[in-house]
């Protein structure tokens, strides 16, 4: 055991070595490294597997009751400050190590197939290994300074991975948005760390928490200053875990590849903020005001994320807002003092959310050959439907993840979410109502996604006329294409450029050639016939003059004679889905808070015994009492599921091929349509931020530019111009001619006489009037 603890440094070093090896090889020997792309993936997976084995061993030692352990080295020391680096092993660390490594290795196995077509395959694995290493280093850090170092590395890796397809403007903008938004939180976190050290004189987490509590108890610190430092510390986790109002980066982060979306939302970046609050729990709990702020921020975030997810049509963005909502629960729990419930939900949510995201990636991977490689189509649920028939394993695992996230027993998230709901009612009726309503909304929007995606009829081979204005975008391959906005996505009049074998380019409807050439060849389509149809228009100056009949004949050949349907994903992707489905089913039982015949089943409470909270149970309740307390949370979730079933499920009489959301015209319909628009457009919060921050910054910049150009430069340039003309005037006055001097002297004397005469007349007139 001692040897295992002393070698804990191997856990973050293994993926770091993999990242550096692959990255340096790609930098110095790009061709050779790319030719060994599968070897690079195997190295990354193997080294992370070593880290996972050590993590599980440490977790087992913690379950057996072995004491916590710190491994420290002196980094910086003088008479005023002492700073150490090292590793901290405690129950929270061990659970997070297992979560990060297990989810990370399954994401890597999944990525081997998902990213196999991508030219950035090797670069992706280098980033992925560095991302995992950074999160593992953060989890093992014993002090806030070391946490901050790895915190920034996690942010940097998220920037690289969100913008992985940087040739797409949307991806480039998304990674910048995530980076800048998190800079706000990171700046607050840095100030909070410095302020905390100024108050306590220590960087060690346990020492500063104890000193801080002692100072609060003895009134040795100003409460306003203490709360200010605590809120600054909380600003970092609020941004990292996408808490309101710093949540706006999260849905745009879906521009990255789906495997990294799973890792960000399940076990790394979003989890980092919750982990930090849990790590600093004893520091925060000394300040009731700060705890109240944390709980309300979490509650508002949970409800806001759930309401925005209601009308999303992008599958990944719907899951992204679900991620925003669930960490809201996790932030609410420590805010009300329920440390155990927050840590428990962090674990159960990681596997469920990773399963859902990888399931969505499997769907997208199968939809791309049919509807095209644009995210606006391949991720749009309007094109899906009935996928369970063609992708039974993906559909089943996605359903398991959906049931878990909705809090349906006996799946993983039920046990943790129900505990948060019960504790919320105990702490505050308002927070209880918020958490309870959010649970109902979660059941609705999650099953809305499931029904629209996996039930009904497949809609990917259908197209409809669209008269709405189209919007341009750039696909991952860099081709400029067009897509219609929100509702009418099946377009016959959106065009893309196409090149025939002779090298000439034509604009053809995008939905005609949305299939990749390899899939068309597999269906034995006569591509040469299509080229011959277009060849008659080869000499036309206007490429838009291509006959509509040409498109109709090509479209009929593709759509009517060779209709394509999705296929189940590769075995490596299915292996990850099935592997994640296992903890989604069973991991919740480690925290079941009841005992039977003297046998305690709540391993999590025993594991977190040193960190008990005000809601810690004595494990004396039986199974019947526990399920009676869970009736309200399960009931509201089932209400949401039922409403979703009747609107979007197989019993729905609406034609989901035309519009997946119902439309009505009465007052109630107006209300729901307004709510739908509010949800679809993200509560207009992004628009508000654009007006306040982006447009406001532009207006301020233009105002400052105007002031600088016309006022500051005007004063400086005006003085220069006056000096110039004054000098010119004096230069002409010194011509060297005596008549000119005499003329000037006479004119000057005359002017002086005139001034004296006028002055004397004014004085005499004044004296005359004063006599009376």
Curated annotation (Swiss-Prot):
One of its GO terms (biological process) is electron transport coupled proton transport. Pfam families: Proton_antipo_C (PF01010), Proton_antipo_M (PF00361), Proton_antipo_N (PF00662). It is found in: Plastid, Chloroplast thylakoid membrane. GO terms for molecular function: NADH dehydrogenase (ubiquinone) activity; quinone binding. Keywords: Chloroplast, Membrane, NAD, NADP, Plastid, Plastoquinone, Quinone, Thylakoid, Translocase, Transmembrane, Transmembrane helix, Transport. GO terms for cellular component: chloroplast thylakoid membrane. It catalyses: a plastoquinone + NADH + (n+1) H(+)(in) = a plastoquinol + NAD(+) + n H(+)(out); a plastoquinone + NADPH + (n+1) H(+)(in) = a plastoquinol + NADP(+) + n H(+)(out). Its EC number is 7.1.1.-. Its main location: plastid. InterPro entries: NADH_UbQ_OxRdtase_chlpt_su5_C, NADHpl_OxRdtase_5_subgr, ND/Mrp_TM, NU5C-like, Proton_antipo_N. It is a multi-pass membrane protein. The chain crosses the membrane at residues 8-28, 39-59, 87-107, 120-140, 147-167, 185-205, 219-239, 258-278, 291-311, 395-415, 425-445, 574-594, 631-651, 710-730, 738-758. PANTHER family: NADH-UBIQUINONE OXIDOREDUCTASE CHAIN 5. Belongs to the complex I subunit 5 family. NDH shuttles electrons from NAD(P)H:plastoquinone, via FMN and iron-sulfur (Fe-S) centers, to quinones in the photosynthetic chain and possibly in a chloroplast respiratory chain. The immediate electron acceptor for the enzyme in this species is believed to be plastoquinone. Couples the redox reaction to proton translocation, and thus conserves the redox energy in a proton gradient. NDH is composed of at least 16 different subunits, 5 of which are encoded in the nucleus. This is NAD(P)H-quinone oxidoreductase subunit 5, chloroplastic. It comes from Angiopteris evecta.
